Amino acid sequence: MISALDSIPEPQNFAPSPDFKWLCEELFVKIHEVQINGTAGTGKSRSFKYYEIISNFVEMWRKTVGNNIYPALVLALPYRDRRIYNIKDYVLIRTICSYLKLPKNSATEQRLKDWKQRVGKGGNLSSLLVEEIAKRRAEPSSKAITIDNVNHYLDSLSGDRFASGRGFKSLVKSKPFLHCVENMSFVELKYFFDIVLKNRVIGGQEHKLLNCWHPDAQDYLSVISDLKVVTSKLYDPKVRLKDDDLSIKVGFAFAPQLAKKVNLSYEKICRTLHDDFLVEEKMDGERIQVHYMNYGESIKFFSRRGIDYTYLYGASLSSGTISQHLRFTDSVKECVLDGEMVTFDAKRRVILPFGLVKGSAKEALSFNSINNVDFHPLYMVFDLLYLNGTSLTPLPLHQRKQYLNSILSPLKNIVEIVRSSRCYGVESIKKSLEVAISLGSEGVVLKYYNSSYNVASRNNNWIKVKPEYLEEFGENLDLIVIGRDSGKKDSFMLGLLVLDEEEYKKHQGDSSEIVDHSSQEKHIQNSRRRVKKILSFCSIANGISQEEFKEIDRKTRGHWKRTSEVAPPASILEFGSKIPAEWIDPSESIVLEIKSRSLDNTETNMQKYATNCTLYGGYCKRIRYDKEWTDCYTLNDLYESRTVKSNPSYQAERSQLGLIRKKRKRVLISDSFHQNRKQLPISNIFAGLLFYVLSDYVTEDTGIRITRAELEKTIVEHGGKLIYNVILKRHSIGDVRLISCKTTTECKALIDRGYDILHPNWVLDCIAYKRLILIEPNYCFNVSQKMRAVAEKRVDCLGDSFENDISETKLSSLYKSQLSLPPMGELEIDSEVRRFPLFLFSNRIAYVPRRKISTEDDIIEMKIKLFGGKITDQQSLCNLIIIPYTDPILRKDCMNEVHEKIKEQIKASDTIPKIARVVAPEWVDHSINENCQVPEEDFPVVNY
C-alpha cells in the first residue's frame, strides 16, 4: 500500500551542519535554565517560555540550516535514538577516572559513585563528571565539532560496542569517545555524556519540540516509532497527515490492538461479542510484532512500545534464536505478524513466568542454538496484519487467521500459532476458563469473529477473561514512581494519575457496565491522555531486587529533588500526611508493575496518601520499560475496579475509596442522600445551638460516607451555627454540641479535657424527627459517666427509646444485638502490625490436600500456623491451596481433585467466580524468607 507521504522527497539542508555547541546553547541550556530558575520577573508561564525557546530554535533551524532537523532531533531525544551504546553510569565514571589517571577507588571516584547523595537542584552525573574534568585541565580551544561530527562519533560508538565488550577499559581506548572528551567544550561535554547515557536532554519537553516542528509529528511518531522517517516525511507544516498515513507499514513499529478487561456476566460478554467469537489462551509473555521483509533477508522484532529487539531474536533467516525458524511459503515476500514472546522450559515442557523472556533469548544467543539451553524463547503468533504490500487490518479476524495458517508453518516449541476455537454462548466461555485454570494459564481472550484490527486501540472486539483469585486486588497495577525514602531498603512512593476535567467527569458516570453494547468501535483507548495531576497512593519496597534498585537508580539519577530543599509542585504532585524524603517529576521517572492483595483504608493509613486509601500487601512484579508514565493506572481506574476480595478487615471498595479530591472538594456520597436532604424543609431545629463537627460519618446500614462539610452544611440549613475553636470558651458550654464518630487526634484531646462527644446520628435523627431529641445511649460517642447514666434511663432493656418512634429495621437490629451473643469475631490486625513475621499469613486460610500420612504436609501446615495463618480441610473455605508433594503421581492426583472442584464452582456461577490460587510448597518458604507474600503465580504447580 503506497502512501501519499512515500512520494515526498527527503528534505535537504542548504547550509552545512551547525556546531554542536550552538545546539547546546540555543536549546539545551535555555530549557535547563527555565527548569532550574523558573520565569520569575518575565510575566510568562514556564510552558509558554518552553514553547518560546523551542519555536525560536525551530525557526532559526529552518532559516539558517534547512528542512532536515533529524541530526539535531536525534541528539535532543536520545531515548528515541535507535543507536545502542551499552554505557551505564558505573562504566562512564570508571572511564573518566581512568582518563584522568586517578587511582582505583580514589576519593574522587567514590564521590562520583555516590553522586546522588550530593547532587544539588538540577544537577546530574554528567555535570559532576565535567566538574572533575574542569578541575584538572583547561577548556579546549580546538576546532569546533559540528552536529554531524557528533552523530558520526556516536555511530562509531554504537558500532564497536560488541568489539571487546563494553567495559570502561574498552571505552577509555575508544578513539571517537576520546576525541569528544578531549575536544568538546565543558557545555558540550555535559550534554554529550547525557546523550550516551540516554538521559532526557530537554527534560520532558520532547512533545513541544515535535509539535513545533510539525503539528502531526508526535502522532506520526507514535505509529512509525522512527525519528528518521518522521523527519524525512514531515518537514513542511502545511502538508498534513491523512487517515491512511497512520496505518501499518512494514519495517516500522506500531502500537498494537489490546484486549479489554471487563467485569461483566458471561451473558453480557456473549452479547457484546454477538454470540460469535474465537477463544484463545492468554499468554504470560511480551507482546512482539515481527516484520518480515524481502523474503527473509531482513527481519525486525519490535515490542509493544516500539523497542527494537532484533538483536535478541535475529535479523534474517540465516541466524537468530527465532528468525531462523520462521517458515513461510515461497510466495511471501513481506508480512507483519502479531504475537506473544514467552519462555519455554524444554525439560519440564512448560511456559515460564514473563520475567525470563529476554533472559532466555540472551542465553540462547550465547549458545548459538536454542537446543543447547534448558529454556528458550517461544514465539506464539495469533494474527497476520500485513501481506505482500497490503494491509490486512480491515479484514475480519477469521479471514486473517486463515491467511496466517496458509502462509506460516509452525515449528513446535519455537514458533507456534496460537490455537483458537470458534465458540457460541455462555457455556463455551465457562468451559474455556476451566481449561485455562487446569493448565495454569493466565486466562483466555475472546475475539469477535468478524472484527477488524484496530491499531493503537483497546475496544470491545477483544475481551480478556482471567480467573478471579481470592486475596488479590484484580489486575496488577502499573504505577508511576513519584517519591523515595532511604533505609536499609529504599522504598518508592507511587501515584495514581488524575486525568483532565473532561475525561474525569466522563468516568464519573455509571460504571456498572464498562462495555457499551451499542457500539463496537467507540471504546478506543486514547494512548495520549492528558494528565492533570498525580495523587500519592502507596509505598513499595518488596519484590525489588538489588539489580532492579540499581537500574531504577540509573534511570532516574540526577532527577531526584530533596523535599526539604525543593517542595514538590502542588499543581503536579499531591501527597497525604506521608511526604517522601525525595520526589521526582513523573516525566523523568519510571513505571513499576505492582501486585496487591486488597485496598487498605484503615484509620492509621487512610490519611497517609492523597487517595485516602492505599494497597495492602503491595509487591513489585517488574519494571515496565515498555510503559509511558501517561499510560499508568488512573484514579478513575480505581473507581471502576472490582470489589475488594475476601479479607474481612476491608469493606467494599466504593466505601473504602474515600477518594476526596481536596482541590475540588468533591463528596463521595450517594444520590439518595442528596435527594433526602433536598426533600427536608429548611427549619430552625438547631436554633440557638453551636456545633463543632470533628469527623466524617459512614452510615452503618448503607456504607455511605457523609463528609464533615456535608454535616456542617446540613446543620446550618436547619438553624445551627458552626464554631471552630471550643478551647477559647467564647460561648456558653451548654449550647455547644461536639459531633464525631472517630477518635481523631483533636477529638481525643477534647475528650481528655472533659468534653462530651455526640455521634452524628443524633444530628440526622433530629432532622428526621423534625425536633430536638433527648440524648440516648446510641448517640453517646464518648461522654461522661453522669451523662451516660441519664441517657440509659431514656431507653428500655433492649435500647428502645421511651420517647421516639422506632423503625422496623432499627428494632430488628436492637433485637439481634441484645438477644443473640455473636461469636468472637476475627482479630482485626492493623496493617502496620501485619508487617511483623508473626502475622505474615494472617489473612490466609490454606487448604493442603493429603494423599498419605506425610511429614511434608505437617511441616507446611505448621509454617502457615506459626506465621499467623489458618488451615482448613475444605477447599470451599480456603483462599490458598498448597500442593505439598514432589512425587509426580501424588501431585497429579491432588491437582485433578482440586480442578474438579474448581470446575464445579465455575459451572454454578453466572459470572467469573473468585477462586483460590494453587501454589507449590516453595511459595511458603520464599514468602517467609522475604517477609512478605510473594506472587503466587511465580510458584505454579508443574510436572504433574
Curated annotation (Swiss-Prot):
The active site is at K282. Signal peptide: none annotated. ATP binds at E280, K282, R287, E340, F382, E442, K447, K464, K466. Its EC number is 6.5.1.1. One of its GO terms (molecular function) is metal ion binding. Disruption phenotype: Delayed meiosis I; sporulation results in an increased proportion of tetrads with only three viable spores. Very mildly sensitive to ultraviolet (UV) light and methyl methanesulfonate (MMS). It holds the Pfam family DNA_ligase_A_M. Its main location: nucleus. Mg(2+) 1 binds at E340. Mg(2+) 2 binds at E442. SUPFAM superfamilies: BRCT domain (SSF52113), DNA ligase/mRNA capping enzyme, catalytic domain (SSF56091), Nucleic acid-binding proteins (SSF50249). It comes from the Eukaryota. DNA ligase involved in DNA non-homologous end joining (NHEJ); required for double-strand break (DSB) repair. This is DNA ligase 4. The gene is DNL4.
